[in-house]
């Protein structure tokens, strides 16, 4: 059998951005926007409750579906990670995801609901009311702002799993036609570790791979990197925007860049992870700035209107399992009913981006203060054809990107369509039964399967009945094996979950001492390789080579410890075959920390 030479390279570099620049508004140069040390103010809506603006979108116009199950997110806030499988019920996440998708349509089953979403989307795109066709590409933009693998809130792995389950297992979308990505961030570890064993052929991407000169901005922004779009998004037939419920900035009267740029991060700012250079957009989204305010340009509106971003979005989802109080914050509990000092443990979905952003803003504002002018971008988007700013947005011919309004109060959460007083938003609560049969958790470690079920008459593992509702089953397998756990009522399966335990053969180990080192990479006495130099200034790389078969499948397991994750690339016979196979990161910040922490595992098929 012939051999190829595989090379893996790791690169470390730093970049400094200067944030105070002259910017142009409506074709005129305005004074330099310098926000350091200034007051972000506090948000007070200028529009009264239940006074909708814009034109509602969706099969049910203006509908935002909301599902809440307090037993879905059960992390105690202290032990382990919020993303751990025993802290989130896959069954309950599946039910919430299914509930909000069905609620957006006129259907009563999840397969028919997705089919209607695809057909409606294609009809509006001028393709006719056709269903999904095998081979069409779907991208899922998730939020990995903090690189995954810590208790700073990112996309919940169980949420990504649930979406892939619906697309792959129910709608029969080929795994290799799906890409899950955040092109602006350095890690996908927690999501990848949980999801990849079951869906190994899905494309999991983070940093890299941009198509130049795709995005044009209506004002201010001319940077070439900001005009580039992630290749995955550019080539997709369908975009699924899977955001978080996140307050981006904690208001302060002495702003610094670390405080954050804008009020909230939901489906709008989530797309900053799709563009090649983000800092040039920051000035334009500081609606709280004394240089801006209500009725001013906001670049998020351009992304919402863009044909390859907002215009290519099949559905908007908000993973609200845990609310992040700041762009790099840890989960915060909500006090008001139905949360009752608990996690939000929710999902939202809509076909109207302005509406779902408005609802996310209202939820956050009901519990946390926001910086001034938090909904300026929604006023602009709802009225893009004739916005308060007077900006001639590139997407102005759309007239409106959706409907915006504020609910009547944080207790009743009623919008104009709920009240029957207008054609604004409808917040639809998906009915759920907390006492339904469920798999509360099911996962594997190196030695055993761990499971817990509730309200089941019978529990089966790979078709064999288990005597206990919860337990630990020792593992003794010599090859990769799939395990399927089922809960039954009246002999009928009501919930199931699959776990795949991988066993690798022909394992080869590449020692750090065998690496080729360049620049700031040094070999330590203990045999590890370290990048030395001041933070943000050291530049270097390490690489190693291994012979592999011309065809087949292989996995790479790379252990790396450091506070600054670094990118890595694959080369075969000298040719780079990946934009970036992933940033490597662990929980430790110093050499020797992070034992047993996160490892990067990548798979590459050679043909």
Predicted segments with their positions:
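Short coil/turn motif common to extracellular beta-sandwich-like domains
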Residues: 441-450, 551-553
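Extended, low-polarity segments enriched in aliphatic/aromatic residues
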Residues: 29-134, 145-434
